[in-house]
From Swiss-Prot:
The active site is at H56 (tele-phosphohistidine intermediate). The keyword Thylakoid does not apply. Disulfide bonds: none annotated. This is Mannitol-specific phosphotransferase enzyme IIA component. It is found in: Cytoplasm.
Length: 60
């Protein structure tokens, strides 16, 4: 997991207009770094509850 948490994959003070835009930006960074494929970004769950959306795996 350390390759996912490099300084290149941490973004501070990024302006977005929606949760979806934030997820898209984070997903694009992971795709660009080669950590995941675009297909993965399209199917990953993001809902965590209480207005929080974080890409995460599921049991499916």
């Amino acid at each position: 997991m350390s390759e996912l948490f490099s300084n290149d994959n941490i973004f501070l003070n990024v302006n977005v207009n929606s949760q979806n835009e934030a997820i898209e930006k984070a997903g694009k960074a992971l795709v660009d770094s080669g950590a995941v494929t675009d297909a993965y970004i399209q199917v990953v769950s993001t809902f965590m509850g209480n207005g929080l959306a974080i890409p995460h795996g599921t049991d499916d």
